[in-house]
Amino acid sequence: MAKDYYKILGVDRNASEEDIKKAFRELAKKWHPDLHPDNKAEAEEKFKEISEAYEVLSDPEKRRIYDQTGSVDFGGGGSNFNWDNFTHFSDINDIFNEIFGGNFGSDFFSGFGNRQSTRNIDLDMYTNLDISLEEAYYGTEKRIKFRRNAICPDCKGTGAKNGKLITCPTCHGTGQQRVVRGQGFFRMVTVTTCNTCGGKGRIPEEKCPRCNGTGTIVVDEDITVKIPRGATDNLRLRVSGKGQSYDGRTGDLYVILRIKQDKNLQRINDDLLLDQKINFGQAALGADIPIQIFNEKYNLKIPEGTQPGDVIKIKGAGMPHLNGHGSGDLLVRINVEVPKRLTAKQRELIRELFDIKENHKSWFH
């Protein structure tokens, strides 16, 4: 049967976020399990119920789904709430401060939200790799050398000789250490990761001699990374299983590409822009001139009357698309060179040209 979260908190279905929070705080203080030592089981169940209602109604998206369907999926395809689903421990901590006057948890919460899991440790590694635009154009292979922590091959990451582990004598397998303050039902508990086992709950019966019980050894890696054709700046290449190792797990290495600027070419997405100089005669009369980018040669057709700054496109001669289908275009921007020194004959011809210009609206009509 679906739960009526509004009824549980005692609020109207149109209640504001502030009304919902206020109702939860009042009920949480009323039903805190440490205040009901003679009926703790009922108090714990009631406290969990109002916390479930608050988790749903205080979240706009969860509340919207609940209002439409009458239930909320807390993960795993089911609607059963547990404390792993609760995301408002800071609100409960504020309530604890009001009740007990200190920033402490409770026996009731000693197992929720406090244990640090090694699963949350980021074991991935990241490194930048500089490549040229030409290398990005053709694709290439690059060697990378680096140092990392790898799983000890002798103990397989357990840190124990022959892989034999025993229950931690300090935390008795919980991975936690608790400090209790106060007496009776005003007990206040802080929970920390066990210093002996590091939160694992088990320790080596005898330390592995190769890694001295750490489960990892330092190794120097020398690997080859394949750079794909058409690689882009900031592209991340994942090398599986070459990250840091800890607690029997290993992360990945991410190689982040940095493409250096080319002195002749500018990349615009998958197009390439090339500045090409031509002389006055080629611009005026038109011409066919050879051009080259990297190892690729093309014939550039200059139309008659080409102006400075005109862009001529060679379709499909740009960067290869990263997905492997087709390429961008090569854009050739024309720069018309004006000679700084002229022979007498050249001067005479230019004067004749200007004489023609005086009788026409433009040089070329």
From Swiss-Prot:
UniProt GO molecular function: ATP binding; heat shock protein binding; unfolded protein binding; zinc ion binding
Zinc finger residue ranges, CR-type: 139-220
SUPFAM superfamilies: Chaperone J-domain (SSF46565), DnaJ/Hsp40 cysteine-rich domain (SSF57938), HSP40/DnaJ peptide-binding domain (SSF49493)
An annotated GO BP: DNA replication
Keywords: Chaperone, Cytoplasm, DNA replication, Metal-binding, Repeat, Stress response, Zinc, Zinc-finger
UniProt binding sites for Zn(2+) 1: C152, C155, C208, C211
Gene3D superfamilies hit by this protein: DnaJ domain, Heat shock protein DnaJ, cysteine-rich domain, Urease metallochaperone UreE, N-terminal domain
The keyword Cytoplasm belongs to this UniProt entry's keyword annotation: yes
Localization (cell): Cytoplasm
The protein's required cofactors: Zn(2+)
Keyword Zinc-finger: yes
Family statement: Belongs to the DnaJ family.
Description of its domains: The J domain is necessary and sufficient to stimulate DnaK ATPase activity. Zinc center 1 plays an important role in the autonomous, DnaK-independent chaperone activity of DnaJ. Zinc center 2 is essential for interaction with DnaK and for DnaJ activity.
Protein name (record): Chaperone protein DnaJ
Protein's organism: Thermoplasma volcanium (strain ATCC 51530 / DSM 4299 / JCM 9571 / NBRC 15438 / GSS1)
Lineage, broadest ranks: Archaea, Methanobacteriati, Thermoplasmatota, Thermoplasmata, Thermoplasmatales
